[in-house]
Amino acid sequence: MVDWSTLPEELLHFIAARSFSLVEYKRFSSICVSWHSSVSGVKKNPFHRRPLIDFNPIAPSETLLEDHVFSCNPGAFLSRAAFFRVTLSSSPSKGWIIKSDMDTNSGRFHLLNPLSRFPLRISSESLDLLDFTVSEIQESYAVLKDAKGRLPNPGYQRSALVKVKEGDDHHHGILGIGRDGTINYWNGNVLNGFKQMGHHFSDIIVHKGVTYVLDSKGIVWCINSDLEMSRYETSLDENMTNGCRRYYMRFVDCCGELYVIKRLPKENSRKRKSTLFQFSRTAGFKVYKIDKELAKWVEVKTLGDNAFVMATDTCFSVLAHEYYGCLPNSIYFIEDLEPKVFQLDNGNGSSITRKSESSESSFEMFFPSFL
């Protein structure tokens, strides 16, 4: 067996420099003494000597959705949130999901509700990376009204980080779906309405380096680095999107393939005012993917061991057996601030379970006991 602690220091520097997140960098330094020494020192390692992630506790005056009081400070702010799989280092087969963004001034992590962007009240002040293994599994971006608030800018209810060509160079910018269904582009200074060809848009995703947007008619569009739109070769059939309104359809990447989730409302959506969090009650979901042989979108009857996590700012898939309490062939979502899970029809009919109605074991992966 290879003794990893004896790797050359030059190689360790090479590995550490390519850590894709701050958490991975900290995890690297906690593996063994020689690895920690290779990145120690003020110039090499700007972090604490003890490999901790420090959480930023929420003060009682902090703005939360349920408080119904929101800051109105001027200045839009780009927030990157990350989803992490956390396991006990001694038992890595199953884990939990936590979500955080970072305070730009202190460098401390804000823990967020995994299904929304609102803060969690926690009792723990830190997470010891000697006891836990933390791996980033998904990221999401939001243009917030201000740096302290948690409300997205109305023009960016769904957002994606994209590379945009400016002359001979490429720069990062944000494409977002507005509350009115329009597409907007933000480069950190300018909010611009995006000239578009489709109907009201519902979601946006960067999949395998290509930016896709989905409109309320089920038409999929591609946006290139010149911010030019073109219609994707395959769109959802009209009967798949009949009666669907914007925000009722979402993209999700599962095992490298692109899926569309359609939310089915219980009542006529026109009877209620639709906002980001207030829809008609959900009756269920339908899932679609592209059949490459038929060259069309087809309904997916089972997700197998996969579960979809449909957060307010992004959607992604996980393998159910890798997380505590996670139900396979299911979709986790939030409605009226309450976590819910929809189980696709497995022969016994489909069903929706609310966290308050269950033993909570089905939602255990979102609420780890160590926080």
Curated annotation (Swiss-Prot):
User: F-box domain spans which residues?
Assistant: 2-49
The source's superkingdom equals Eukaryota
Listed InterPro entries: KIB1-4_b-propeller, SCF_F-box_domain
Signal peptide range in chain numbering: none
Q: What is the name of this protein?
A: Probable F-box protein At1g65740
State the organism named in the record: Arabidopsis thaliana (Mouse-ear cress)
